[in-house]
């Protein structure tokens, strides 16, 4: 395993002057980079990747250097230490990997066009210009770009443009910043712009394949988010502008480049006349996440990648804080509970999972750090826990001090805890180290022993696990006055239970509000007490009850069969939050039945009973003045009713398709994917399939594209599935950025499992060549592990991936995913009969 050598230890750059001449036609790039900095050694190293170095001068004299492609480095011998200026001339090419400098392709009126953009996080700035490509190596940047320019085209960067000279567009010098946050783009763009109260210019940019009104929502959210953060952080936005740019080809979801934030089109643009509340929520949280980074990540940056959580966890929490302030009616924390909290609790219960704060031993491991369920979701839950513990006043005071102390510099997690701890007068660091530096989380067992109410913590596992006597300082958030704020010991006796119950006059509960990262296992007496009064619980507390029971069943601490009879009572809810968790649990039952079996017929009947009343109440059409919950619930219950083969719901979907066949994009966005999928599954033909696939290629509406992908991958026709799989490597049909969704859709289809699994094994090298530099590459393995559930597939998975265990960046993912499948296979074997019997009993 190659250890990472930190180039910053020998050379501290202070400024860069970068001139780039780029041709879209030939894909050639000619560059000159001048770096001034402080050499601490006579032998320094500069990062480069795939650059052809033509000349390197040191203080104006020909330099002594060697290029080391394996180390992605230029080794430079200097005549002396101290201040030095390097001038490096080089050539390279536009990449085709969505990393470095690369073209995006799109169509306007049948004409293919190119928009060139960049993606430099984590270590791809070195593909664009020689640099010390490490977060700590902050410097200023003077950028000039020349390209094969056509009239009306726009060029953007982190800072405003100052002049055009000899075809080069010059930009204002940046503030001191990290290389991975540099960005630029050029092409035929449209924009809408406004200003914040403090005078920051805010703009949204997109290709002209989109309607102008698709930019409006993002512009409004971006402007108000910046204003919110300036107030919340008590720290001004530090740049003259904040551009939001939608790129047609983009491997990540979005990227927080300072002053020029880049996004997938699906996460920035939406049609205000036909969208869903959930789409608005997702787009708003993505924008708020990236803009939170402009302070937390950009102004103050982690010192090294092992503190990546410091950037991502904080932005993940703040996106919800901001959107909740901007759109309080949305109840956005409910989205956090169902997406972030659930993902973190599931992933973090597998033995071998990374901790939030994790060491990086190999350069290839940096991208593998971006584990959404841990670094983003669990980390955000840790910070939500801190916020609940110290309150917003101390949080804001601490952040203001943190930004003032470290602005334009770097920081570690300890710096943040120190600032927050001083503001709150609490030992935040001591509490948080137990959560950030060790993986996993506890289950707190609450039981009545010899008349006393006793709490006990132990590490919770889904599957086999080595507990290692880990212990946490747990914010208990109990609803009895006698419960301390923190559980700091393994066990705690709260005293006589009946006395406690009589005094408090309510069922005993822990983690009220579900803001702490643990689950609770109540003994039967305590659980029955809660369930007897379950309708009095808030929606979040009902979700938590279902969520904890589900996880306990996944961990074999209780049986899924015990949960089945509870589900019908939760089906009566009017809460979208509870409904979403209800169907999460109900969908988990599908693994216990074989497709087309008599057991699945019974499960479908159970789904029918769960969804019958709400589907009838909500119907396919939105009612005037209906609640946000009704809007969000409609697709959930209709999807369940379609799985149940509810004849009325299926017929209504077919009728809606026929009535709107000539204008499918105009179907209400909330139900469109269900209507089209139902048609493909039950009334499809090769002609319809071909037509929808053509529509997928033609449309620039990301939401409609997603709907078509979901529908087409659900076809029951094996020949049509095989046609789809043949298009996986055809970027004219399926862009590499979208391939994972298509692969997952086909693999999840019982008819498609064989073709998709064969394809990825046969074409693994192609996949690695195409998206191997992408931080999402390893998630193809996660997708497979999320679906496979038979001993045969487990054996095939191990046979294919175990030889790849030594691949840096894949080791942890493969190891964990083998455990995930093993655990699921064992759970099905143990629980199948009991679950099927419970379902049969529930529908009698």
Give a label for each model feature.
Residues 103-105, 156-163, 185-190, 276-279, ...:
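Short intrinsically disordered coil segments
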Residues 53, 171, 204-465, 598-609, ...:
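Hydrophobic alpha-helical and helix-loop surface patches within well-folded domains
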Residues 99-100, 181-185, 215-217, 273-275, ...:
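Short conserved micro-motifs at the rims of enzyme active sites and ligand-binding pockets
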Residues 72-74, 258, 672-673:
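Short glycine-rich loop/turn motifs
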Residues 111, 195-199, 261-262, 350-357, ...:
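Short alpha-helical hairpin
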Residues 144-146, 206, 292, 359-363, ...:
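Non-catalytic accessory/interaction domains
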Residues 1-240, 266, 271, 362, ...:
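Acidic/His-enriched low-complexity segments
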Residues 139, 150, 165-166, 238-239, ...:
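Short, well-ordered loop/turn elements at secondary-structure boundaries
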């Amino acid at each position: 395993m190659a250890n990472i050598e930190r180039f910053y230890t020998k050379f501290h750059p202070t400024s860069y002057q970068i001139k780039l001449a780029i041709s879209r036609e030939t894909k050639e790039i000619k560059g000159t980079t001048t770096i001034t900095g402080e050499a601490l050694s006579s032998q320094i190293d500069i990062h480069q990747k795939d650059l052809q170095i033509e000349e390197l001068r040191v203080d104006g004299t020909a330099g002594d250097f060697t290029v080391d492609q394996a180390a992605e480095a230029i080794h430079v011998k200097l005549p002396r230490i101290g201040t030095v200026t390097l001038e490096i001339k080089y050539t390279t090419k536009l990449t085709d990997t969505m990393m470095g400098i690369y073209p995006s392709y799109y169509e306007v009126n049948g004409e293919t066009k190119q928009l060139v953009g960049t993606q430099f996080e984590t270590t791809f700035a070195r593909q664009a210009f020689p640099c010390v490509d490490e977060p700590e190596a902050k410097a200023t940047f003077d950028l000039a770009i020349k390209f094969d320019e056509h009239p009306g085209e726009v060029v953007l960067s982190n800072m405003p443009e100052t002049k055009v000279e000899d075809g080069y567009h010059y930009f204002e010098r940046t503030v001191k910043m990290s290389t991975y946050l540099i960005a630029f783009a050029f092409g035929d763009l449209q924009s809408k712009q406004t200003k914040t109260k403090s005078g920051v210019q805010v703009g949204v940019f997109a290709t002209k394949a989109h309607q102008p009104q698709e930019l409006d929502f993002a512009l409004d959210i971006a402007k108000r988010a910046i204003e919110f953060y300036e107030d919340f952080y008590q720290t001004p936005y530090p740049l003259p502008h904040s551009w939001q740019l939608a790129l047609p080809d983009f491997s990540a979801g979005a990227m927080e480049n300072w002053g020029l934030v880049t996004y997938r089109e699906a996460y920035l643009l939406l049609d205000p006349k036909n969208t869903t509340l959930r789409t608005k929520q997702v787009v708003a949280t993505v924008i708020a996440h990236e803009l939170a980074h402009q302070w937390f990540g950009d102004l103050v940056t982690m010192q090294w990648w092992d503190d990546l959580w410091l950037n991502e966890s904080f932005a993940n929490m703040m996106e919800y804080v901001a959107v909740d302030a901007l759109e309080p009616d949305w109840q956005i924390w409910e989205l956090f509970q169902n997406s972030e909290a659930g993902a973190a609790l599931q992933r973090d219960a597998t033995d071998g999972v990374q901790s939030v704060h994790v060491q990086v031993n190999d350069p290839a491991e940096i991208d593998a750090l971006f584990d959404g369920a841990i670094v983003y979701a669990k980390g955000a839950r840790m910070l939500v826990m801190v916020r609940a513990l110290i309150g917003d006043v101390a949080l804001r005071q601490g952040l203001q001090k943190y930004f003032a102390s470290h602005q334009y510099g770097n920081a570690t997690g300890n710096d943040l805890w120190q600032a927050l701890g001083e503001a709150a007068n609490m030992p935040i660091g001591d509490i948080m180290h137990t959560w950030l530096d060790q993986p996993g989380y506890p289950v707190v067992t609450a039981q009545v022993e010899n008349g006393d109410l006793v709490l006990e913590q132990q590490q919770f596992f889904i599957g086999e696990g080595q507990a290692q006597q880990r212990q946490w300082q747990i914010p208990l958030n109990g609803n009895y006055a006698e419960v301390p704020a923190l559980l700091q010991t393994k066990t705690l006796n709260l005293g006589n239970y009946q006395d406690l119950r009589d005094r408090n006059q309510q069922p005993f509960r822990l983690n009220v509000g579900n803001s702490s990262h643990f689950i609770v296992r109540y003994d039967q007496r305590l659980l029955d007490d809660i369930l007897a009064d379950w309708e009095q619980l808030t929606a979040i507390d009902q979700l938590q009850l279902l969520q904890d029971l589900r996880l306990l069943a996944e961990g074999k601490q209780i049986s899924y069969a015990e949960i089945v009879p509870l589900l019908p009572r939760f089906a009566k809810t009017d809460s979208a939050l509870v409904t979403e968790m209800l169907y999460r649990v109900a969908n988990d039952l599908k693994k216990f039945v074989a497709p087309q079996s008599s057991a699945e017929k019974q499960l479908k009947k159970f789904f029918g009973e769960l969804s019958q009343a709400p589907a009838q109440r909500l119907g396919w059409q939105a009612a005037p003045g209906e609640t946000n919950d009704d809007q969000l619930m409609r697709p959930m219950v209709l999807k369940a009713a379609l799985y149940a083969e509810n004849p009325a719901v299926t017929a209504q979907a077919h009728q809606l398709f026929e009535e709107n066949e000539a204008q499918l994009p105009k179907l209400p966005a909330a139900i469109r994917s269900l209507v089209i999928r139902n048609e493909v599954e039950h009334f499809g033909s090769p002609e319809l399939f071909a037509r929808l696939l053509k529509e997928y290629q033609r449309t620039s509406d990301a939401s409609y594209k997603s709907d078509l992908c979901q529908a087409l991958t659900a076809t029951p026709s094996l020949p049509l599935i095989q046609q789809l799989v043949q298009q996986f490597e055809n970027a004219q049909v399926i862009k590499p950025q979208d391939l994972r969704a298509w692969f997952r859709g086909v693999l999840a289809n019982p008819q498609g499992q064989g073709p998709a699994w064969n394809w990825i094994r046969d074409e693994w090298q192609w996949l690695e060549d195409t998206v191997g530099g992408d931080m999402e590459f390893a998630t193809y393995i996660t997708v497979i592990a999320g679906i496979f559930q038979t001993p045969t597939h487990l054996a095939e998975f191990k046979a294919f991936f175990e030889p790849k265990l030594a691949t840096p960046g894949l080791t942890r993912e493969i190891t964990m995913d083998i455990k995930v499948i093993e655990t699921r296979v064992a759970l099905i074997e143990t629980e199948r009969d009991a679950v099927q019997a419970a379902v049969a009993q529930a529908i009698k």
